Amino acid sequence: MCSVSGVLILNPKNFEKVELKLASILKKAEDRGRDSFGIVVIQKDGTVKVRKSIGKPSEKEELLYGILDEDSRVVIANNRAEPTTEYVRQKTEDDIQPFIGDRYIVTHNGIIANDLELEKKYELKRKTKIDSAILPLLLDKTWDGNLEALKGILEQIKGSFALVIGDKKNPDRIFLAQNFKPLYMAYDHSLESLFFTSLDEYFDAKPFDPVNITKLEPYSVVMVTSNKLITTLPIMEKRKKYRVLVVASGGLDSTVAATKLLREGHEVTLIHFNYHHKAEEKEREAVRKIAEYLQIPLLEINTDLFKIIGHATLIKGGGEIVKDRKGEEGAEFAHEWVPARNLIFFSVSLAIAEAYGYDAIASGINLEEAGAYPDNEMEFIRMLNKLSPYATGPNKRIEILMPVGNLVKHEIVKLGYEIGAPLHLTWSCYEGGQKHCGKCGPCYMRKMAFRINGLKDPVEYDEE
Protein backbone atom coordinates (compact mmCIF):
# COMPACT_ATOMS: atom_id res chain seq x y z
CA MET A 1 0.00 0.00 0.00
CA CYS A 2 1.12 3.54 -0.64
CA SER A 3 0.68 7.22 -0.40
CA VAL A 4 0.56 8.87 -3.81
CA SER A 5 1.55 12.49 -4.25
CA GLY A 6 2.04 15.03 -6.98
CA VAL A 7 2.43 18.69 -7.85
CA LEU A 8 1.29 20.80 -10.78
CA ILE A 9 3.54 23.88 -10.74
CA LEU A 10 1.76 26.94 -12.10
CA ASN A 11 4.51 29.44 -11.28
CA PRO A 12 7.94 27.83 -11.80
CA LYS A 13 9.71 30.72 -10.04
CA ASN A 14 8.48 29.25 -6.74
CA PHE A 15 10.19 25.89 -7.36
CA GLU A 16 12.40 26.05 -4.23
CA LYS A 17 9.44 26.59 -1.89
CA VAL A 18 7.41 23.98 -3.78
CA GLU A 19 10.24 21.53 -3.18
CA LEU A 20 10.21 22.26 0.55
CA LYS A 21 6.47 21.65 0.76
CA LEU A 22 6.71 18.44 -1.28
CA ALA A 23 9.45 17.18 1.03
CA SER A 24 7.22 17.88 4.03
CA ILE A 25 4.34 15.95 2.42
CA LEU A 26 6.54 12.94 1.65
CA LYS A 27 7.91 12.82 5.19
CA LYS A 28 4.43 13.00 6.70
CA ALA A 29 3.24 10.30 4.30
CA GLU A 30 5.64 7.76 5.81
CA ASP A 31 2.78 6.35 7.88
CA ARG A 32 1.35 5.00 4.60
CA GLY A 33 4.70 4.02 3.11
CA ARG A 34 8.02 3.26 4.83
CA ASP A 35 9.80 0.78 2.54
CA SER A 36 10.66 2.96 -0.44
CA PHE A 37 9.95 6.32 -2.02
CA GLY A 38 10.34 7.92 -5.40
CA ILE A 39 10.08 11.30 -7.12
CA VAL A 40 9.76 11.83 -10.87
CA VAL A 41 9.80 15.36 -12.29
CA ILE A 42 8.54 16.22 -15.77
CA GLN A 43 10.33 19.21 -17.25
CA LYS A 44 8.72 21.67 -19.66
CA ASP A 45 10.39 19.90 -22.62
CA GLY A 46 9.02 16.50 -21.56
CA THR A 47 12.27 15.11 -20.18
CA VAL A 48 12.26 13.62 -16.68
CA LYS A 49 14.42 13.67 -13.57
CA VAL A 50 14.23 10.73 -11.17
CA ARG A 51 15.07 10.12 -7.50
CA LYS A 52 14.30 6.71 -5.99
CA SER A 53 15.43 4.95 -2.84
CA ILE A 54 14.57 2.22 -0.39
CA GLY A 55 13.76 3.35 3.15
CA LYS A 56 12.00 6.44 4.46
CA PRO A 57 12.21 9.97 3.05
CA SER A 58 13.14 11.28 6.50
CA GLU A 59 16.20 9.00 6.48
CA LYS A 60 17.29 10.11 2.99
CA GLU A 61 16.47 13.82 3.11
CA GLU A 62 19.29 14.72 0.75
CA LEU A 63 17.28 13.04 -2.05
CA LEU A 64 14.29 15.31 -1.47
CA TYR A 65 16.07 18.51 -2.43
CA GLY A 66 17.80 19.88 -5.51
CA ILE A 67 15.59 18.05 -7.98
CA LEU A 68 13.30 20.93 -9.03
CA ASP A 69 14.28 23.94 -11.10
CA GLU A 70 12.57 26.68 -13.13
CA ASP A 71 11.88 24.24 -15.95
CA SER A 72 10.01 21.77 -13.69
CA ARG A 73 6.29 21.53 -14.37
CA VAL A 74 4.86 18.29 -12.91
CA VAL A 75 5.96 16.12 -10.00
CA ILE A 76 4.78 12.54 -9.45
CA ALA A 77 5.78 10.90 -6.15
CA ASN A 78 5.17 7.82 -4.02
CA ASN A 79 5.72 6.41 -0.52
CA ARG A 80 5.34 2.63 -0.50
CA ALA A 81 4.53 0.11 2.21
CA GLU A 82 5.39 -3.18 0.55
CA PRO A 83 2.50 -5.68 0.66
CA THR A 84 3.33 -9.16 1.90
CA THR A 85 2.18 -10.57 -1.46
CA GLU A 86 4.69 -8.42 -3.38
CA TYR A 87 7.75 -8.62 -1.15
CA VAL A 88 11.01 -8.15 -3.07
CA ARG A 89 14.16 -8.96 -1.07
CA GLN A 90 16.69 -7.31 -3.38
CA LYS A 91 15.02 -4.18 -4.70
CA THR A 92 16.24 -2.23 -7.68
CA GLU A 93 14.99 1.08 -9.06
CA ASP A 94 12.61 -0.93 -11.27
CA ASP A 95 10.77 -2.09 -8.13
CA ILE A 96 10.18 1.42 -6.77
CA GLN A 97 7.30 3.72 -7.69
CA PRO A 98 6.52 5.93 -9.54
CA PHE A 99 6.74 3.75 -12.63
CA ILE A 100 7.85 5.36 -15.87
CA GLY A 101 6.62 4.48 -19.35
CA ASP A 102 7.52 5.86 -22.75
CA ARG A 103 4.89 8.58 -22.33
CA TYR A 104 3.20 8.27 -18.94
CA ILE A 105 4.47 8.30 -15.36
CA VAL A 106 2.17 6.70 -12.78
CA THR A 107 2.04 6.53 -9.00
CA HIS A 108 -0.53 4.05 -7.69
CA ASN A 109 -2.09 3.29 -4.33
CA GLY A 110 -4.08 0.06 -4.23
CA ILE A 111 -4.01 -3.43 -5.68
CA ILE A 112 -4.44 -4.59 -9.28
CA ALA A 113 -5.76 -8.13 -9.05
CA ASN A 114 -5.79 -8.78 -12.81
CA ASP A 115 -2.32 -7.47 -13.70
CA LEU A 116 -1.27 -10.81 -15.21
CA GLU A 117 -4.38 -10.92 -17.40
CA LEU A 118 -3.77 -7.36 -18.62
CA GLU A 119 -0.12 -8.13 -19.28
CA LYS A 120 -1.08 -11.12 -21.41
CA LYS A 121 -4.00 -9.43 -23.20
CA TYR A 122 -1.98 -6.40 -24.32
CA GLU A 123 1.38 -8.22 -24.68
CA LEU A 124 3.09 -6.02 -22.10
CA LYS A 125 6.43 -6.74 -20.43
CA ARG A 126 7.19 -5.53 -16.92
CA LYS A 127 10.64 -5.29 -15.37
CA THR A 128 9.25 -6.16 -11.93
CA LYS A 129 6.52 -8.32 -10.45
CA ILE A 130 4.97 -5.26 -8.75
CA ASP A 131 1.37 -5.03 -10.00
CA SER A 132 1.43 -1.22 -10.36
CA ALA A 133 4.18 -1.44 -12.98
CA ILE A 134 1.61 -2.61 -15.51
CA LEU A 135 -0.09 0.80 -15.53
CA PRO A 136 2.27 3.03 -17.56
CA LEU A 137 2.74 0.19 -20.06
CA LEU A 138 -1.02 -0.22 -20.38
CA LEU A 139 -1.53 3.52 -20.79
CA ASP A 140 1.30 3.82 -23.31
CA LYS A 141 -0.34 1.17 -25.46
CA THR A 142 -4.02 2.10 -25.14
CA TRP A 143 -4.41 5.76 -24.15
CA ASP A 144 -4.24 8.92 -26.24
CA GLY A 145 -4.45 11.36 -23.30
CA ASN A 146 -8.21 11.91 -23.57
CA LEU A 147 -9.99 11.92 -20.21
CA GLU A 148 -13.06 10.03 -21.44
CA ALA A 149 -10.79 7.33 -22.86
CA LEU A 150 -8.98 7.03 -19.52
CA LYS A 151 -12.28 6.22 -17.85
CA GLY A 152 -12.81 3.33 -20.27
CA ILE A 153 -9.33 1.94 -19.68
CA LEU A 154 -9.71 2.02 -15.90
CA GLU A 155 -12.96 0.07 -16.15
CA GLN A 156 -10.78 -2.90 -17.14
CA ILE A 157 -8.88 -2.83 -13.84
CA LYS A 158 -9.97 -5.30 -11.20
CA GLY A 159 -8.97 -4.04 -7.78
CA SER A 160 -8.43 -0.72 -6.05
CA PHE A 161 -6.66 2.43 -7.14
CA ALA A 162 -5.81 6.03 -6.54
CA LEU A 163 -3.61 7.28 -9.37
CA VAL A 164 -1.62 10.41 -10.10
CA ILE A 165 -0.50 10.40 -13.74
CA GLY A 166 1.94 12.63 -15.59
CA ASP A 167 2.12 12.95 -19.38
CA LYS A 168 5.52 13.71 -20.94
CA LYS A 169 3.82 15.02 -24.09
CA ASN A 170 1.69 17.42 -22.07
CA PRO A 171 3.69 18.74 -19.10
CA ASP A 172 1.05 21.41 -18.53
CA ARG A 173 -1.39 18.97 -16.93
CA ILE A 174 -1.82 16.19 -14.43
CA PHE A 175 -4.36 13.36 -14.33
CA LEU A 176 -5.97 11.80 -11.27
CA ALA A 177 -8.17 8.75 -10.89
CA GLN A 178 -9.65 6.84 -7.98
CA ASN A 179 -12.24 4.29 -7.07
CA PHE A 180 -12.51 4.06 -3.28
CA LYS A 181 -8.88 4.91 -2.51
CA PRO A 182 -8.57 8.49 -1.20
CA LEU A 183 -7.05 11.47 -3.01
CA TYR A 184 -6.87 15.08 -1.83
CA MET A 185 -5.99 18.25 -3.72
CA ALA A 186 -4.67 21.50 -2.23
CA TYR A 187 -4.07 24.72 -4.11
CA ASP A 188 -1.44 26.86 -2.39
CA HIS A 189 -2.09 30.45 -3.44
CA SER A 190 1.26 31.69 -2.13
CA LEU A 191 3.20 29.07 -4.12
CA GLU A 192 0.82 29.10 -7.10
CA SER A 193 0.98 25.32 -7.21
CA LEU A 194 -1.48 22.48 -6.89
CA PHE A 195 -0.51 19.62 -4.57
CA PHE A 196 -2.00 16.13 -4.39
CA THR A 197 -1.67 13.38 -1.80
CA SER A 198 -3.51 10.51 -0.11
CA LEU A 199 -4.56 12.19 3.16
CA ASP A 200 -5.40 15.83 3.77
CA GLU A 201 -3.38 15.95 7.00
CA TYR A 202 -0.17 15.59 4.97
CA PHE A 203 -0.67 19.13 3.64
CA ASP A 204 -0.24 20.40 7.22
CA ALA A 205 -2.36 23.45 6.40
CA LYS A 206 -3.04 25.88 9.24
CA PRO A 207 -6.37 27.78 9.57
CA PHE A 208 -5.02 31.04 8.10
CA ASP A 209 -2.78 29.50 5.42
CA PRO A 210 -3.71 30.53 1.85
CA VAL A 211 -4.57 26.94 0.94
CA ASN A 212 -7.78 25.40 -0.41
CA ILE A 213 -8.11 21.66 0.25
CA THR A 214 -10.58 19.46 -1.64
CA LYS A 215 -11.28 15.74 -1.41
CA LEU A 216 -11.65 14.29 -4.87
CA GLU A 217 -14.87 12.44 -5.57
CA PRO A 218 -14.59 8.63 -5.30
CA TYR A 219 -15.04 6.75 -8.59
CA SER A 220 -13.91 9.64 -10.76
CA VAL A 221 -11.20 10.70 -13.20
CA VAL A 222 -9.86 14.25 -13.19
CA MET A 223 -7.67 16.37 -15.43
CA VAL A 224 -6.10 19.57 -14.08
CA THR A 225 -4.21 21.97 -16.33
CA SER A 226 -1.81 24.80 -15.60
CA ASN A 227 -4.40 27.37 -16.74
CA LYS A 228 -6.58 26.22 -13.79
CA LEU A 229 -9.02 24.15 -15.80
CA ILE A 230 -10.38 21.16 -13.86
CA THR A 231 -12.41 18.50 -15.66
CA THR A 232 -14.04 15.67 -13.73
CA LEU A 233 -15.84 12.61 -15.09
CA PRO A 234 -17.55 9.86 -13.08
CA ILE A 235 -16.22 6.34 -13.60
CA MET A 236 -19.61 4.94 -12.62
CA GLU A 237 -22.54 6.58 -14.39
CA LYS A 238 -25.58 7.42 -12.26
CA ARG A 239 -28.95 6.10 -13.30
CA LYS A 240 -31.71 8.69 -13.74
CA LYS A 241 -34.18 6.48 -11.88
CA TYR A 242 -33.00 4.72 -8.74
CA ARG A 243 -33.92 1.60 -6.85
CA VAL A 244 -34.29 3.11 -3.39
CA LEU A 245 -34.56 1.47 0.01
CA VAL A 246 -36.39 3.89 2.32
CA VAL A 247 -35.94 3.54 6.08
CA ALA A 248 -39.57 3.95 7.17
CA SER A 249 -41.00 4.27 10.66
CA GLY A 250 -44.59 4.66 9.58
CA GLY A 251 -44.47 8.34 10.53
CA LEU A 252 -45.04 11.53 8.56
CA ASP A 253 -41.47 12.20 7.51
CA SER A 254 -40.49 8.85 6.03
CA THR A 255 -43.93 8.41 4.45
CA VAL A 256 -43.69 11.74 2.64
CA ALA A 257 -40.07 10.96 1.67
CA ALA A 258 -41.07 7.60 0.18
CA THR A 259 -44.07 9.08 -1.63
CA LYS A 260 -41.95 11.88 -3.08
CA LEU A 261 -39.40 9.40 -4.45
CA LEU A 262 -42.21 7.29 -5.87
CA ARG A 263 -43.81 10.29 -7.58
CA GLU A 264 -40.42 11.14 -9.10
CA GLY A 265 -40.39 7.77 -10.81
CA HIS A 266 -38.00 5.85 -8.60
CA GLU A 267 -38.51 2.21 -7.64
CA VAL A 268 -39.14 2.30 -3.90
CA THR A 269 -38.99 -0.39 -1.21
CA LEU A 270 -39.65 0.36 2.46
CA ILE A 271 -37.49 -1.10 5.22
CA HIS A 272 -38.88 -0.99 8.76
CA PHE A 273 -37.17 -1.86 12.05
CA ASN A 274 -39.06 -3.43 14.94
CA TYR A 275 -36.63 -2.71 17.76
CA HIS A 276 -38.61 -3.33 20.96
CA HIS A 277 -39.74 0.30 21.19
CA LYS A 278 -42.94 1.50 22.85
CA ALA A 279 -44.78 2.24 19.60
CA GLU A 280 -43.55 -0.94 17.87
CA GLU A 281 -46.98 -2.46 17.25
CA LYS A 282 -48.60 0.79 16.07
CA GLU A 283 -45.67 1.67 13.79
CA ARG A 284 -45.63 -1.82 12.29
CA GLU A 285 -49.36 -1.62 11.62
CA ALA A 286 -48.94 1.83 10.04
CA VAL A 287 -45.99 0.97 7.79
CA ARG A 288 -47.73 -2.16 6.50
CA LYS A 289 -50.81 -0.13 5.56
CA ILE A 290 -48.63 2.55 3.93
CA ALA A 291 -46.76 -0.03 1.83
CA GLU A 292 -50.07 -1.56 0.75
CA TYR A 293 -51.54 1.87 -0.08
CA LEU A 294 -48.50 2.89 -2.15
CA GLN A 295 -48.29 -0.62 -3.66
CA ILE A 296 -44.60 -1.00 -2.87
CA PRO A 297 -42.61 -3.79 -1.16
CA LEU A 298 -41.84 -3.77 2.56
CA LEU A 299 -38.93 -5.40 4.39
CA GLU A 300 -39.23 -5.82 8.16
CA ILE A 301 -36.21 -6.26 10.40
CA ASN A 302 -36.72 -7.55 13.94
CA THR A 303 -33.98 -6.80 16.44
CA ASP A 304 -33.47 -6.90 20.21
CA LEU A 305 -30.26 -4.89 19.93
CA PHE A 306 -31.67 -1.76 21.56
CA LYS A 307 -33.20 -3.81 24.35
CA ILE A 308 -29.64 -4.87 25.11
CA ILE A 309 -28.25 -1.34 24.76
CA GLY A 310 -31.00 0.11 26.97
CA HIS A 311 -30.74 3.64 28.41
CA ALA A 312 -33.55 5.02 26.25
CA THR A 313 -37.08 5.97 27.30
CA LEU A 314 -38.29 5.16 23.77
CA ILE A 315 -37.63 1.46 24.46
CA LYS A 316 -40.20 -0.64 26.31
CA GLY A 317 -39.42 -0.54 30.02
CA GLY A 318 -37.08 2.41 29.51
CA GLY A 319 -38.97 4.95 31.61
CA GLU A 320 -41.47 7.72 30.98
CA ILE A 321 -41.72 9.77 27.80
CA VAL A 322 -41.28 13.52 28.45
CA LYS A 323 -44.64 15.31 28.03
CA ASP A 324 -44.02 18.68 29.65
CA ARG A 325 -45.64 21.82 28.18
CA LYS A 326 -48.06 19.68 26.11
CA GLY A 327 -45.18 18.11 24.23
CA GLU A 328 -43.23 21.26 23.36
CA GLU A 329 -40.43 20.22 25.73
CA GLY A 330 -40.09 16.89 23.94
CA ALA A 331 -40.03 18.61 20.57
CA GLU A 332 -37.13 20.87 21.52
CA PHE A 333 -34.70 18.43 23.13
CA ALA A 334 -33.66 14.81 22.48
CA HIS A 335 -35.01 13.35 25.73
CA GLU A 336 -35.89 10.11 23.92
CA TRP A 337 -32.50 9.66 22.29
CA VAL A 338 -31.73 6.03 21.38
CA PRO A 339 -27.94 5.47 21.25
CA ALA A 340 -26.66 5.40 17.64
CA ARG A 341 -30.07 4.23 16.37
CA ASN A 342 -30.07 5.94 12.99
CA LEU A 343 -26.46 4.97 12.31
CA ILE A 344 -27.32 1.33 13.01
CA PHE A 345 -30.43 1.49 10.83
CA PHE A 346 -28.46 3.05 7.98
CA SER A 347 -25.64 0.52 8.32
CA VAL A 348 -28.03 -2.43 8.08
CA SER A 349 -29.89 -0.77 5.21
CA LEU A 350 -26.63 -0.06 3.39
CA ALA A 351 -25.64 -3.73 3.65
CA ILE A 352 -29.02 -4.88 2.31
CA ALA A 353 -28.88 -2.27 -0.46
CA GLU A 354 -25.44 -3.48 -1.52
CA ALA A 355 -26.41 -7.15 -1.39
CA TYR A 356 -29.62 -6.71 -3.39
CA GLY A 357 -28.53 -4.11 -5.93
CA TYR A 358 -30.21 -0.93 -4.71
CA ASP A 359 -28.79 2.37 -5.93
CA ALA A 360 -29.66 4.39 -2.85
CA ILE A 361 -31.11 4.41 0.64
CA ALA A 362 -33.25 7.22 2.02
CA SER A 363 -35.12 8.29 5.13
CA GLY A 364 -37.30 11.04 6.53
CA ILE A 365 -34.43 12.93 8.16
CA ASN A 366 -35.43 16.60 8.18
CA LEU A 367 -34.46 20.07 9.25
CA GLU A 368 -36.99 20.29 12.10
CA GLU A 369 -35.73 17.31 14.10
CA ALA A 370 -32.11 18.22 13.35
CA GLY A 371 -32.54 20.87 16.02
CA ALA A 372 -32.78 18.20 18.71
CA TYR A 373 -31.27 15.02 17.27
CA PRO A 374 -27.68 14.91 15.94
CA ASP A 375 -28.48 11.98 13.64
CA ASN A 376 -31.25 14.00 11.96
CA GLU A 377 -28.81 16.69 10.91
CA MET A 378 -28.20 17.07 7.16
CA GLU A 379 -24.48 16.90 7.93
CA PHE A 380 -25.02 13.36 9.24
CA ILE A 381 -26.24 12.30 5.80
CA ARG A 382 -23.47 14.23 4.04
CA MET A 383 -20.89 12.39 6.13
CA LEU A 384 -22.57 9.04 5.52
CA ASN A 385 -22.38 9.73 1.79
CA LYS A 386 -18.66 10.35 2.14
CA LEU A 387 -18.32 7.11 4.12
CA SER A 388 -20.42 4.96 1.78
CA PRO A 389 -17.71 4.23 -0.84
CA TYR A 390 -15.46 2.90 1.95
CA ALA A 391 -18.20 0.82 3.61
CA THR A 392 -19.30 -1.05 0.47
CA GLY A 393 -17.45 -3.32 -1.91
CA PRO A 394 -15.43 -2.21 -4.96
CA ASN A 395 -17.57 -0.69 -7.71
CA LYS A 396 -20.61 -0.60 -5.41
CA ARG A 397 -21.78 3.00 -5.16
CA ILE A 398 -24.81 3.54 -2.94
CA GLU A 399 -26.08 7.06 -2.28
CA ILE A 400 -27.85 8.17 0.88
CA LEU A 401 -30.72 10.49 0.01
CA MET A 402 -32.73 12.91 2.14
CA PRO A 403 -35.87 13.80 0.15
CA VAL A 404 -37.21 16.04 2.93
CA GLY A 405 -33.86 16.89 4.52
CA ASN A 406 -34.21 20.65 4.04
CA LEU A 407 -37.83 20.87 5.25
CA VAL A 408 -39.41 21.55 8.63
CA LYS A 409 -42.47 19.68 9.87
CA HIS A 410 -45.21 21.95 8.52
CA GLU A 411 -43.47 21.99 5.11
CA ILE A 412 -43.39 18.18 5.15
CA VAL A 413 -47.13 18.05 5.86
CA LYS A 414 -47.77 20.56 3.06
CA LEU A 415 -45.67 18.54 0.61
CA GLY A 416 -47.32 15.30 1.68
CA TYR A 417 -50.78 16.77 1.15
CA GLU A 418 -49.82 18.09 -2.31
CA ILE A 419 -48.34 14.81 -3.58
CA GLY A 420 -51.02 12.57 -2.11
CA ALA A 421 -48.99 10.86 0.60
CA PRO A 422 -51.14 8.64 2.86
CA LEU A 423 -50.90 10.96 5.87
CA HIS A 424 -54.06 9.40 7.30
CA LEU A 425 -52.23 6.08 7.75
CA THR A 426 -49.19 7.44 9.57
CA TRP A 427 -48.29 7.01 13.25
CA SER A 428 -46.23 9.74 14.92
CA CYS A 429 -46.68 9.15 18.66
CA TYR A 430 -43.88 7.80 20.86
CA GLU A 431 -46.48 5.84 22.82
CA GLY A 432 -48.26 2.75 21.57
CA GLY A 433 -51.84 3.41 22.68
CA GLN A 434 -55.03 3.10 20.67
CA LYS A 435 -54.80 6.80 19.79
CA HIS A 436 -51.99 9.33 19.59
CA CYS A 437 -51.29 10.55 23.14
CA GLY A 438 -51.30 14.21 22.07
CA LYS A 439 -48.68 15.15 24.67
CA CYS A 440 -45.30 13.83 23.47
CA GLY A 441 -42.91 15.79 21.27
CA PRO A 442 -43.89 14.20 17.93
CA CYS A 443 -47.60 14.63 18.70
CA TYR A 444 -47.01 18.31 19.47
CA MET A 445 -45.11 18.91 16.22
CA ARG A 446 -47.66 16.98 14.19
CA LYS A 447 -50.62 18.95 15.54
CA MET A 448 -48.83 22.26 15.00
CA ALA A 449 -47.81 21.32 11.44
CA PHE A 450 -51.38 20.54 10.38
CA ARG A 451 -52.67 23.65 12.15
CA ILE A 452 -50.17 25.93 10.35
CA ASN A 453 -51.32 24.53 7.01
CA GLY A 454 -55.00 24.95 7.89
CA LEU A 455 -55.52 21.22 7.46
CA LYS A 456 -57.47 18.79 9.62
CA ASP A 457 -55.19 16.16 11.12
CA PRO A 458 -56.68 12.81 10.05
CA VAL A 459 -55.57 10.93 13.20
CA GLU A 460 -57.23 10.89 16.63
CA TYR A 461 -55.68 12.01 19.92
CA ASP A 462 -56.35 11.07 23.52
CA GLU A 463 -55.84 14.74 24.40
CA GLU A 464 -56.29 17.64 21.98
From Swiss-Prot:
Keywords: ATP-binding, Glutamine amidotransferase, Ligase, Metal-binding, Nucleotide-binding, Zinc. Its cofactor is Zn(2+). The active site is at C2. InterPro entries: GATase_2_dom, Ntn_hydrolases_N, QueC, Rossmann-like_a/b/a_fold. Its EC number is 6.3.4.20. GO terms for molecular function: ATP binding; ligase activity, forming carbon-nitrogen bonds; zinc ion binding. The keyword Ribosomal protein does not apply. Pathway: Purine metabolism; 7-cyano-7-deazaguanine biosynthesis. The keyword Zinc applies. PROSITE patterns: GATASE_TYPE_2. Zn(2+) binds at C429, C437, C440, C443. Binds 1 zinc ion per subunit. This is 7-cyano-7-deazaguanine synthase. It comes from Saccharolobus solfataricus (strain ATCC 35092 / DSM 1617 / JCM 11322 / P2). The lineage of its organism: Archaea, Thermoproteota, Thermoprotei, Sulfolobales, Sulfolobaceae. The gene is queC.
